Amino acid sequence: MNILWHIRFYPPGSNCGSDWYAHELNKFFVSVGHSVKVMLSENDAPYNLDGVEVIAKPVNWGDPISWADVIFTHLDFTPNTCQMVQRKPIVWIMHNTFDYSTVRRNKDRVKVVYNSEAAKEQIWYPNESFVLPPPVDIDYYRVTPGDYITLINLNEAKGAEVFYKLAELMPNQKFLGVKGSYGKQIVKKLPNVEILETQRDIREVYKRTRILLMPSAYESWGRTATEAMASGIPVICTDTFGLRENCGDAGIYCDRKDIQKWVEMIEKLQGKKEYIAASKKARKRAEQLRPDTKLEQFDKFIHHITKKEYDTNRNKSIS
């Protein structure tokens, strides 16, 4: 099957969770024999990443569209994709619960992929759909944790102010802040805070992390929580609908405004017994989130919407 993506950004140039969602899914598609191309609006130099062909901006947009059996898109490229593609099925990956009227208006052509069951409940579309949480290769992200308390993406919505307040209140703890790929990054100089630039390989961050903080105002899933749990790193987070479904009972939930509660949970994890217990729960939850079965089911869904025959004897590995 020929699969085409029409989106704005793609790894390794982008480290956004939505773009890594696309790449992890594409790695699976390649592993089971599909051909995958990614068409970026501003890309002038083609490259190949894990078997995924990222093509240069075409002179004629119709050529890659004619090649494809199905076209994937997400976020702000959705209206443009629907306008460009008239006779092929479109798969729209839903990364948030903001309403996309273009998707509703094209309910017969556009298939919806929700990133969580909770998101589907919050904003239901009449389109044919599938629920596929962000696929994370658990083995790839498994590292030996370090000794920092970490926040990834230092913007206000991700909880940068909470992060710095905790660092001020806990001067004997080491904090690690990692700049994100989007949003205004809030950088403050504190003696116990180290700031890193945006990382191309986020595993280097997890190698230095003992506790991951996610004091987010909004998360429809929260991919970094899954990545951290793969290494048994406890996640202290806000109780958003996405993080609750993602972390399950392994998450340590705090109200974003209750700073003292965050301090208490961090202090609790300083105990060896408490940390080991939380780490085991995190690893267990990560194992439950292995995407292999869901990806196989999703591939059958794609065969269904493209009216292609599904081969039950092919390779089923995701990597």
Could you say what each language-model-derived stretch is?
Residues 17, 257, 273-303, 310-314, ...:
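A charged, aromatic-enriched C-terminal amphipathic alpha-helix characteristic of glycosyltransferases
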Residues 138-189, 195:
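Conserved catalytic-core segment of nucleotide-activated headgroup transferases in glycan assembly
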Residues 204-209:
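Short alpha-helical donor nucleotide-sugar binding micro-motif in glycosyltransferases
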Residues 217:
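Aromatic "clamp/platform" in nucleotide-sugar-dependent glycosyltransferases that forms part
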Residues 234-237:
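Short hydrophobic beta-strand element within catalytic cores of glycosyltransferases
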